[in-house]
Design a protein with these regions (language model features):
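N-terminal anchoring/assembly modules that precede and organize ATP-driven motor systems
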Residues: 1-49, 83
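P-loop NTP-binding catalytic core
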Residues: 40-46, 51, 56-138, 160-162
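Walker A (P-loop) phosphate-binding loop of P-loop NTPases
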Residues: 142
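Conserved lysine of the Walker
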Residues: 145
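Hydrophobic positions on the alpha1 helix immediately C-terminal to the Walker A/P-loop
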Residues: 148, 152
């Protein structure tokens, strides 16, 4: 039952283009949200024991320590939704003073979009890459900061192997 519910959550989030899934403990229950763009949508409210099992499922699949509920943990996986569909996920958990965990899942969509709107103003940024130093990219969630950085590096270091952390 938990596995099927988890697959359904991931499939729905992927199909509607959600960036994040939130499992948040409240006073007497857990709330499940998805974030699409800048909008966080409440999906439903669930019993704490059911959502604790769901969090345990995702932690197990992502290679995290299932029994550790106090310390923050990070994990990632290619989640098998069935029917040959795999969705890349990044997971983060954190416990509260009551021993309840919250879970945030970042859905890493695989489609590659052409960045045509950056082509006009990209040359000054490319010129700045010739100088050593720290480059700061800022903006709201989902605005393309990481995508821009990867595009700049791919353009600047064509034909070379680049590893990002």
């Amino acid at each position: 039952m938990i596995t099927e519910f988890a697959k359904e959550i991931i499939k729905n989030a992927d199909s509607c283009g959600a960036q994040d899934i939130y499992v948040i403990p409240r006073q007497d229950n857990y709330e499940l949200y998805i974030r699409v763009g800048q909008e966080r949508r409440l999906i439903d409210v669930y019993r704490p024991d059911f959502m604790a099992s769901l969090i345990g499922h995702f932690k197990f699949v992502a290679g995290m320590m299932v029994g550790e509920k106090r310390r923050s943990q990070l994990g990632s996986c290619d989640y098998d939704c069935g029917d040959g569909q795999r969705v890349s996920l990044r997971l983060s958990t954190v416990g509260d003073y009551r021993g309840l965990e919250s879970l945030v899942i970042r859905v890493l969509h695989s489609e590659r979009r052409e960045l045509v709107y950056w082509n006009q103003g990209i040359q000054p940024i490319m010129d700045a890459l010739d100088y050593r130093g720290l480059y700061l990219f800022a903006g709201p969630v989902g605005s393309g900061k990481t995508t821009l950085m990867h595009e700049l590096v791919q353009e600047r270091f064509k034909g070379q192997q680049v590893i990002s952390i």
